[in-house]
Structure formats: C-alpha cells, structure tokens
Amino acid sequence: MSSFRKQAALLGLTAAVFAASTAQADEKVTNPDASTTSTPVANQSEKSVAPTGNEKGTASEKTDAPTKQDENATPVTSTNTKPSTETTSSKEGSLADDKALQPTEGQEVDVRILTTTDLHTNLVNYDYYQDKPAENVGLAKTAVLIEEAKKENSNTLLVDNGDTIQGTPLGTYKAIVNPVKEGEQHPMYAALQKLGFEAGTLGNHEFNYGLDYLKRVIDTAGMPIVNANVVDPKTGAYVYDPYKIISKTFVDKNGRKTTVKIGVTGIVPPQILSWDKANLEGKIQVNDSVEAIQKIIPEMRKAGADITLVLSHSGIGDDKYEKGEENEGYQIASLPGVDAVVTGHSHAEFPSGNGT
C-alpha cells in the first residue's frame, strides 16, 4: 500500500475517533458545497464476498433503541495525497491553471476530515424531554468546534454520517405536525448547509417517516446525500446517489495549491427493513453493506477519486464477517481500496478508554 493510502487509512480512523454525536435517540450524519460529479445509476450485484486486506479506519458502535444523549462533533487528521503545483502564466489560460492544480507524485497534503453523526435534530444544547439545558448535545456548540478545527487546518472536508432528522420534538414537528413541503429545506439541513457541510449519508432513522417524506428532505438538503446499498427491489437500480466525487483545492506542505478528488459513499444497516417494515416493505431492498462498498469503490476510482471515504452509518463490529450484519465498520475498513471510514449509529466512543 502506498504511503498516501496508509495515511488516508489513519485519517479515517482518526476521523472516526473524533466523530461525536449530538443525540437523544440513535445514529449518524452529512454536508454540502464543493464541486461534485455524480455517478450513473446501476444495478446492484449480489456476490457474497468476505472482505480481506488490512485495516484502515472506523469509529463508533451501536444499540438501536432510542436512547439518551450523545456527544457531537469532530476533527481528524492528516494524509498525504497525490497533489499538484501552483499555476504559472500560460497562453492556455484556465486550462493551464487546471493542469497546474493536478496532483503530482510525491506531493504531500495534510487533510482533515470533520464529521458529525447521530445529531438527531439536536440543534441547540437543550434536553426537550427533561425541559432543561444540556451541555452534551447541540449542533450550536459543535459549530464552535468546527470553526476552530478549520482554523487549525484549512484543508478540510466536513461531512455528516446520518440520523439527522429524527430524535427531538423538532424532528416530529417537521415530519408530522407541520411536515416539510415540496421545495422547503429541513431546519437541520439548513443549519448544516450554513456551517459548510459538503456531503452526508442516511442513517436508519431517516426512514422513520416514510420514503416520500425522505425524498422531499433530500431534494432540498443543499448537499449530496449518498447511499450505496439501498436499491429498487425490481430493477436493482440505486434509489439514491451511490457516491459523489468532491473536488477540493488544498494547499500542500510547500504552500502549493492542488486539487484533490474525494470520492464519498455511504451505507445504512439492512435491518431498516425490519425496523421500519410498515414504511419500507416491498418498496426498497437493502443490500449487505460490505458487498455494496466492495462494488462501488472501483466505480469511484474509475471516476477519478484520489481518496475514497465511506460514511458508514454502522457500528464498528468485529473481524468476523457475516453477510447482512448491522455493524460492519471494521469489515468495510478492511476492504481493498477503502482509504477512510466514518462510523456511528451506536452512540459509543472509539477508542472507549478501556482498551476497546
């Protein structure tokens, strides 16, 4: 494995370690902006393949009953990528500038991935169930940490790992009492967009209010929402964008600008078909997370991704692969071609502080 890939793997691990959630119910998150290219909708193959390879990055574990709060927030670490050189004067104008920003062999860029997960509509630091302020939840508090992290390293990608739109009275109000209308932006995504989130994925609780509601929310999210394991049960076509390639202009260790293309994809636990059976039965199929990522990684590489990032709304799990497991973060991190993984869903910290 190249030095870049190894460091990218560590990046994912650190991202997972620092990713925290603001939650009173259950899982993880997402984000906007940046130039992106979409991927074609394709059929999902059903190969039962156990992952192999060495470990790359992950975070957080799970229990799926609506539980209490969670933390919130996020920085990560550095990685060196195949970057580029600063532009010089040229008769070709912008074309020459574009070429000058392309990565060159041996160029190193420190990149920080910032993540949130399992926000569960906790916009402010207030526990609505106990009707009092709470210091361990709230996107408003996390926003300060995000700004501080960006000041420390401007080469950042800010993403959300799902379980974003459910969990407090705000989530219920915007889904049941005064539902998000066609063309209206959900308050959670309005806040994430304001903070500069660039991509996100779906958690299991995104499906609590049905597919029609979820579509309205995603359509106005203001950022790419990706998922690679939810497909049409008849055609096998992806229901959501399976990935996005996000082009970021970073500055290398020598002060030269370079463009790095980050391929972002995501998964949700297949168990949503049981947890939300009334909303989902016969309408979608949810493929094994490991197989879905195994299939999509080569497509992202072919589309030009320098780095691959998996937003795994899943706990870490273990080193024993069983098809259809709920928590497959470890297995996904072990797949060839996966550079970084963000996990969540379990409302747990990794490392835990007790050696696990």
Regions found by a protein language model. Name each.
Residues 27, 43-86:
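Long, intrinsically disordered, low-complexity tracts enriched in Ser/Thr with interspersed Pro
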Residues 20-33, 37:
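Sec-dependent signal peptide cleavage junction
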Residues 93-356:
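Acidic, metal/ion-coordinating pockets
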Residues 1-12, 22, 26:
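Bacterial Sec-dependent N-terminal signal peptides
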